[in-house]
Amino acid sequence: VAKSAADRGVLAVLHPHVGTMIETGDEIQQVLHGSSISLCLDTGHLLIGGTDPAELARQAPERIAHVHLKDVDSTIAARVQSGQLTYSEAVKLRMYRPLGQGDVDVPAIIEHLWANGYGGWYTLEQDTILTEEPRDEGPLADVRTSAEYLRRVLGQLH
């Protein structure tokens, strides 16, 4: 797939994601060892699937072509992994946290990718499920918190 896409001027990128064929650490390792396709480092879905995204950034920085930054409460993620909660239930319980308020080592990921010449995009994601109109700013407040955190982390790289 990667070669066929490249022959057409397109970069194919695999996005490991909860609830798909490529979710767990073993499945990601199979992709890394059995193909040349680039990866989307989705910090949230990797952590929920049992992969340390900072370790993956250290292990295979040359394979990372896109990054989705989100933070995760690993206690809730463990309940998804064990089958105690569905993914949707976990999202409703605020499994996804503003950057810096969860268990993803965002600074280590950014620092390692930066040191290895990563020049791609970082997408800030704040997944949520709203069942009613949010009070005050709702998820917008989380996005602002994440953006401020990201500015601080990036400011420390220079």
What spans do the regions from the language model cover?
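Soluble or luminal CAZymes and related metallo-dependent hydrolases
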Residues: Q101-D105, D142-T145
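C-terminal helical cap(s) of enzyme catalytic domains, especially alpha/beta-barrels
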Residues: P134-H158
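Residues at the N-termini of beta-strands
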Residues: H66, G120-W121
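A structural motif corresponding to the C-terminal end of an alpha-helix
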Residues: V1-A12, P107-G119, R152-H158
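Alpha-helical elements of Rossmann-like donor-binding domains used by nucleotide-donor carbohydrate transfer enzymes
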Residues: E27-Q30, A108, T145, Y149
